[in-house]
């Protein structure tokens, strides 16, 4: 091997070897245990960022480790290639989304290869190709035929100036990002998949996911939001009954008004002859409210003039349109109990409505609703026959009475809504439905799929090219003229089943069941926690759809889930003439730090003093991203990978520090130097355990302890940073160890082979070279080192000796020494015997192998 470590030469050579030998190409092998490792596939934005590098390094470390465990490992990669950014970039760069996307894929593919990730490139695909989305389209039509797909009107962001639908991220402060026109809410027909049919199973099966972070499971439980309650009817004079859902039927006797959503049919009827109410309803509709903001937003409402009749006591209560009632949740109507619900309380206080308390504290303390509602569960009063009942008894009794009178029923409700998959964008998979002239909607027959998205288009930045081109929509169905659906699928559709397509990317169907059932479920999935409620939930749903269609036998797609932390970096800015912040790249800033490493001054390349905004997530908007390419060019891929795995636990945030990268580079140089010095002296003989001295045994014990710890850290705990720290600690001992005798060299040889094998998943290129230099063959197919139980056995033990609770000495005894032998040596230790002079020993306690405690007075 060369004397100097030169990453560029080594990495290019090793990557060429992997390419030529198709090292990471796999097929199904029933004789081997399989391991499917997958990192969330990237959106081809143009260049890799450090978040990608972290995600894919973790995946590659897990894959290579499992490979050395003798498993048949599949690690695929592909491209989540549809989406809005491509449309925006196409408009900006005067091109079409397709060429922009394909160019980015080529560039990023090359970057991934330079980082040495062991992907099976034979399985690569981009979701924007008809070969991929054709199967999604066909599966959608099958779901339609099963009754799991339907169309209904739903609200979208509408720009009246551009006459176009906007995605949520295109609405800035309530206005269109392009022309600054106030955005309206518009009801348009959209396609939905009935995820709610699977709500209970999606909830129950979270308990099967033992390898998932508890936090992600909790987020999904809350998102699914199962609740038990009562659905009841209020009669409305001269109108249809009003249905409401409540989880607190115990408060029913405290209802003083009913709130309905602006989109509720009753609201529309009430507004017909009430211009003021009609205007208020419009205002509500155009104020898009996120559910999270409901608690803090200003509560507004207007009386409809309608009156509802309480189902049990017959009291008349007013019906209000209220901005905090959402049509998408429950029935779009709520029974309001101001005394026992804070939102209802604020509304009633504002509009001078009655507040009637009917629940008091169980402990008998005084009820106080002067400032806020009493929302705890308690004991009923002023509730007629239900007085004195506590929550559960009242729930059951009131529900039973409502059921007996035909006015209500116990029911389970879910917060989860059906999945709206229509997008009024161009760059997505066309929805395979047509409408004939008689208004009937039909799925496109399988023999006419895929419905291909035209790629040679001109983007005007306003209207989708397939909506603008009236000819594109014209087609036939059973020989009759028909119009195609011009909406495209939500891009979560493509990412909900891509993991399964990797199992058989060439299959002439959505999946090849035999191959899919060999590889699935994914054994290890890696990605950001921001995907907890959307992508991860939709993928679980899609997997169950595939199972029920007979394609897979498993219930869940991902066995283990690791959510990697974000990558942070220093961010700097100066204030421009208009008072805005101009962000300066940290690579263009010179900083001075105090003794504790805190930044005391920062000056950019223009000589300007800049403010340090702290360590924050790397992003384009803060201009604090570090280009992985530059780091690879400067230090090599192995150094970047090592820093990524060492600087922080995989699931915690990682602070980017170039000094840390330099440290990782120095460590690799040290390992290289020691291997080079060792191999330059020729081959070493085998370890003869029986012939080792005490010091040699101790060093060899350290080697095998390290193997045991690293194996556990990587395989079970997934604390890769502590595994690396253990190898570094061992390297420090090896560097200082004598190399005089043949057995000294034998131990070092065994140790270096173990070190190289343990570092291989993290830094594969340098380890490939060092492995060969150590006289070994083909590290990619080697075995993970195993520790020798015998080597871990200690001949001697270090025992701490205490007198009256204070440490007075340490003694070395034979590992199998008896209590009497230890006592004799301990009592005669020089410092111990000094402290026993002139006192009476009352008790001697021996904790085997650890402690001798003497009590004396």
Curated annotation (Swiss-Prot):
Catalytic activity, reaction form: tRNA(Leu) + L-leucine + ATP = L-leucyl-tRNA(Leu) + AMP + diphosphate
Compartment(s) of residence: Cytoplasm
Motif 'KMSKS' region, chain ranges: 617-621
Sequence motif: 'HIGH' region, positions: 42-52
Protein origin, superkingdom: Bacteria
InterPro entries on file: aa-tRNA-synth_I_CS, aa-tRNA-synth_Ia, Leu-tRNA-ligase, Leu_tRNA-synth_edit, M/V/L/I-tRNA-synth_anticd-bd, Methionyl/Leucyl_tRNA_Synth, Rossmann-like_a/b/a_fold, tRNAsynth_Ia_anticodon-bd
Keyword Cytoplasm included in the entry's annotation: yes
Protein's UniProt keywords contain Ligase: yes
GO molecular function: aminoacyl-tRNA deacylase activity; ATP binding; leucine-tRNA ligase activity
GO cellular component labels: cytosol
Enzyme Commission code(s) on record: 6.1.1.4
Keyword list, A-Z: Aminoacyl-tRNA synthetase, ATP-binding, Cytoplasm, Ligase, Nucleotide-binding, Protein biosynthesis
GO biological process: leucyl-tRNA aminoacylation
Positions contributing to ATP binding: 620
Enzyme class, broadest EC rank: ligase
Family of this protein: Belongs to the class-I aminoacyl-tRNA synthetase family.
Name of the protein this chain belongs to: Leucine--tRNA ligase
């Amino acid at each position: 091997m060369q004397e100097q470590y030169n990453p560029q030469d080594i990495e290019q050579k090793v990557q060429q070897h992997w390419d030529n030998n198709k090292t990471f190409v796999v097929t199904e092998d029933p004789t081997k245990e399989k391991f499917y490792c997958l990192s969330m596939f990237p959106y081809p934005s143009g260049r890799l960022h450090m978040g990608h590098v972290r995600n894919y390094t973790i995946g590659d470390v897990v894959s290579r480790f499992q490979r050395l465990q003798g498993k048949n490992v599949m690690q695929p990669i592909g491209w989540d290639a549809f989406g809005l950014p491509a449309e925006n970039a196409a408009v900006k760069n005067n091109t079409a989304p397709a060429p922009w996307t394909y160019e980015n894929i080529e560039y990023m593919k090359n970057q991934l290869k330079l980082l040495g990730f062991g992907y099976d490139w034979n399985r690569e695909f981009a979701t924007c190709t008809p070969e991929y989305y054709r199967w999604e389209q066909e599966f959608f039509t099958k779901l339609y035929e099963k009754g799991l797909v339907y169309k209904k009107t739903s609200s979208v962001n509408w720009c009246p100036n551009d006459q176009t639908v906007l995605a949520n991220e295109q609405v800035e402060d309530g206005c269109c990002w392009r022309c600054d026109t106030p955005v309206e809410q518009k009801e348009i027909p959209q396609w939905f998949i009935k995820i709610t049919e699977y709500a209970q199973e999606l909830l129950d099966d979270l308990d099967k996911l033992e390898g998932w972070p508890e936090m992600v499971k909790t987020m999904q439980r809350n998102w699914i939001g199962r609740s038990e309650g009562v659905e009841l009817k209020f009669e409305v004079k001269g109108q249809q009954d009003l249905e409401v859902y409540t989880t607190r039927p115990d408060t029913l006797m405290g209802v003083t008004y009913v709130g309905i959503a602006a989109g509720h049919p009753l609201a529309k009827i009430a507004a017909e002859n009430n211009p003021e109410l009609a205007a208020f309803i419009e205002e509500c509709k155009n104020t898009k409210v996120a559910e999270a903001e409901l608690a803090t937003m200003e509560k507004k409402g207007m009386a409809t003039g309608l009156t509802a009749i309480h189902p049990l006591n017959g009291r008349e209560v007013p019906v209000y349109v209220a901005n905090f009632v959402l049509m998408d949740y429950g029935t779009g109507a709520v029974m309001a109990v101001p005394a026992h619900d804070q939102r209802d309380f604020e509304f009633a206080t504002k509009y001078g409505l009655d507040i009637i308390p009917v629940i008091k504290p169980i402990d008998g303390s005084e009820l106080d609703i002067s400032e806020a509602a009493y929302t705890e569960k308690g004991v009923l009063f002023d509730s007629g026959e239900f007085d004195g009942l506590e929550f559960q008894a009242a729930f059951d009794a009131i529900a039973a009475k409502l059921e007996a009178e035909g006015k209500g029923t116990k029911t389970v409700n879910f917060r989860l809504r059906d999945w709206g998959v229509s997008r009024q964008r161009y760059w997505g998979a066309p929805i395979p439905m047509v409408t004939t002239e008689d208004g009937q909607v039909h799925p496109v027959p399988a023999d006419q799929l895929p419905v291909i998205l035209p790629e040679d288009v001109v983007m005007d930045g306003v209207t989708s090219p397939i909506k603008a081109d009236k000819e594109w929509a014209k087609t036939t169905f059973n020989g009759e003229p028909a119009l195609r659906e011009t909406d495209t699928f939500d891009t979560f559709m493509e990412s909900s089943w891509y993991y399964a397509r990797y199992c058989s990317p060439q299959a002439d169907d959505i999946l090849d069941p035999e191959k899919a059932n060999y590889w699935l479920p994914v054994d290890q999935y890696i990605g950001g926690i921001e995907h907890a409620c959307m992508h991860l939930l939709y993928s679980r749903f899609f997997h169950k759809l595939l199972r029920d269609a007979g394609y897979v036998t498993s219930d869940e797609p991902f066995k283990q889930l690791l959510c990697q932390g974000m990558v942070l970096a220093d961010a700097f800015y100066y204030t421009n003439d208009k008072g805005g912040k101009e962000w300066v790249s940290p690579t263009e800033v010179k900083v001075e730090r105090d003794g504790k490493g805190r930044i005391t001054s920062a000056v950019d390349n223009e000589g300007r003093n800049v403010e340090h905004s702290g360590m924050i997530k790397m992003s384009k908007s803060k201009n604090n991203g570090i280009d992985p390419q530059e780091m690879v060019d400067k230090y090599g891929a192995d150094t970047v990978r090592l820093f990524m795995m060492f600087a922080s636990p995989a699931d915690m945030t990682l602070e980017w520090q170039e000094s840390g990268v330099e440290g990782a580079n120095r460590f690799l140089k040290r390992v290289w130097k020691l291997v080079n010095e060792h191999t330059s002296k020729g081959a070493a003989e085998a370890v003869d355990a029986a012939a080792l001295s005490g010091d040699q045994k101790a060093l060899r014990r350290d080697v095998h302890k390290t193997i045991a710890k690293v194996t556990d850290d990587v395989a079970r705990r997934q604390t890769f940073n502590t595994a690396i720290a253990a190898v570094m600690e061992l390297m420090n001992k090896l560097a200082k160890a004598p190399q005089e005798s043949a057995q000294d060299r034998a131990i070092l040889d065994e140790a270096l082979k173990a070190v190289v094998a343990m570092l291989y998943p993290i830094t594969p290129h340098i380890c490939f070279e060092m492995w060969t230099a150590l006289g070994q063959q083909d590290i990619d197919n080697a075995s993970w080192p195993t520790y020798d139980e015998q080597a871990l056995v200690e001949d001697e033990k270090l025992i701490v000796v205490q007198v009256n609770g204070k440490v007075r000495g340490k003694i070395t005894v034979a590992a199998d020494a008896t209590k009497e032998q230890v006592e004799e040596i301990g009592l005669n230790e020089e410092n111990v015997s000094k402290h026993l002079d002139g006192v009476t020993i009352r008790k001697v306690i021996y904790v085997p192998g650890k402690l001798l405690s003497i009590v004396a007075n």
